[in-house]
Amino acid sequence: MFKITLKRSRPTGKAVRGTMTIPFTQRPVNDKPEQDAVLDTLENADFIIPAGTYPLERTWSPKFKKLLPLVGDVPDREGIRIHRGTIPEHSTGCILTDARGSACLDVLFNRLENYYDNEPIQLQILGQETL
């Protein structure tokens, strides 16, 4: 199982910044170890999901018309995704990353699908349990 970790910092206005770590080093490809990817995230302070551990899978997004990571089992919510974005006020619960973050997530899911028999992924969110 792969675990992605999101560590939130304190909110600044409507923005909650965080750092997402994607552990590429858990299994090397072609005997070449890779470094973890560390990404910046943004969330809307009014709509953040509770801290905890959630299943993460890549599914088709009708809104964005492409495959995107979907955060599962969020209490009283659905459709929470991780996608590119820079303005937290435009989000109603999704976790925003920059273009590099979206590309890193694509690489991770492609590797899981192509090399590791679709091994499950978990998203662990730490910090800011209640705002």
Role assignments for model-derived ranges:
Residues 1-121, 125-131:
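Cell wall/extracellular polymer interaction/catalysis modules
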